[in-house]
Regions:
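Short glycine/serine/threonine-rich phosphate/pyrophosphate-binding segments
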Residues: 65-73, 98
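Short glycine-rich anion-binding loops that position phosphate/pyrophosphate groups of nucleotides
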Residues: 8, 67, 93-95
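A short, charged, Gly/Pro-tolerant segment at domain boundaries
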Residues: 88-98, 104-105
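Nucleotide donor/acceptor-binding cores
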Residues: 84-86
Length: 125
């Protein structure tokens, strides 16, 4: 299962604005062999931010690409999950390069133009 951001043309589709550093492509990759792709999940930009913040609340500091993978895997499992199904995801980046973007308070709302709620486990009681 491939996971990509909305606005990326990696797997076709309309190009669009992407604000999370490192997500998607503006040009279709020449090395991509789509015969290996069984399914495609496209993730909206607020979702990886929320996934990263949820993981950070549990002690894991991952980057925007990993947040996209985790979000996409969760979407795929929600649609296709069944008892005993196991998913494996690749975490391609860590979060230290995203401290001024994904993890900075107010950044998603200002740049992505979408409200990203704080994950429940990170909210004060």
């Amino acid at each position: 299962v491939a996971v990509d951001s909305v606005g990326s043309v990696s797997f076709g589709g309309a190009p669009g604005r992407r604000m999370i550093p490192g997500l998607g492509t503006s040009v279709p990759p020449v090395f991509l062999d789509e015969s290996y792709v069984d399914d495609l999940i496209r993730v909206e930009e607020p979702d990886p931010v929320l996934a990263c913040r949820r993981l950070a609340a549990r002690g894991f500091l991952f980057g925007g690409s990993t947040g996209t993978v985790v979000s996409g895997a969760g979407q795929w499992l929600a649609a296709h999950g069944r008892e005993g199904l196991t998913a494996v995801a690749i975490a391609p980046d860590l979060g230290e390069r995203y401290l001024d973007t994904v993890y900075r308070e107010g950044w998603p709302e200002a740049v992505i133009e979408s409200e990203v709620p704080a994950p429940a486990m990170a909210r004060p009681a």
